Amino acid sequence: MITDWPRLPPRPLPQSVTAFRDETVYSFTTRLAHANRIPPQSLRDYAARESHYVDPERLARLSGYPRHVLCARLRGLTADERDLTRQRARARPICRYCTARRGVPQPVHCWLPDHLTVCHRHGRWIGPSAQRWDDQMSLKHHPAVARSARAHHALAKRNAPDI
């Protein structure tokens, strides 16, 4: 573990990673650390500095993204979303083909609404039971599940438009 980080303000790391909408801070910092060959916990400690939570300003400098972009895309930067246990419990990996399409080779964990259970673009199950990429089953032979998921999503949007 790196314990002797410089006391100077952080500079952007050499490698950046894509920040996905509703991605957890834990997932983003893990991917950023792996891209730069740094232990993830060391990067989180450096981004947090004195507090136990990642500081949005420090993370913005390290990642190369503007602060407002990170605050808009990442979940876990505000006081009510910071709890790491809550982030792990609420997060699910998004469709592995969607991440591969954007050139991301590792899982991206996002806070997905409960009604979002299928990636319709790739026909993959991404519901709450899909906690790993291996759990994302193809629905090619289960068209009724995909149709039901689409109807459920439309119903949720109609009755709760802010979702």
Predicted regions and their residues:
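A structured, charge-rich N-terminal accessory region that forms the first stable segment of a protein
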Residues: 1-91, 110
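Domain-exit/linker segments immediately C-terminal to small folded modules
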Residues: 12, 120-163
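Short linear functional motifs in flexible/disordered or boundary regions
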Residues: 44, 107, 130-132
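Solvent-exposed, non-transmembrane amphipathic alpha-helical segments
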Residues: 49, 79, 115-118, 139
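Short, cysteine/histidine-rich loop/knuckle motifs that typically chelate Zn2+
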Residues: 94-98, 118-121
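Short functional micro-motifs and their immediate structural scaffolds
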Residues: 100-104, 124-127
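A contiguous catalytic/ligand-binding core that recognizes phosphate-bearing ligands
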Residues: 101, 112-113, 120
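Short linker/helix segments within small regulatory modules
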Residues: 106-115
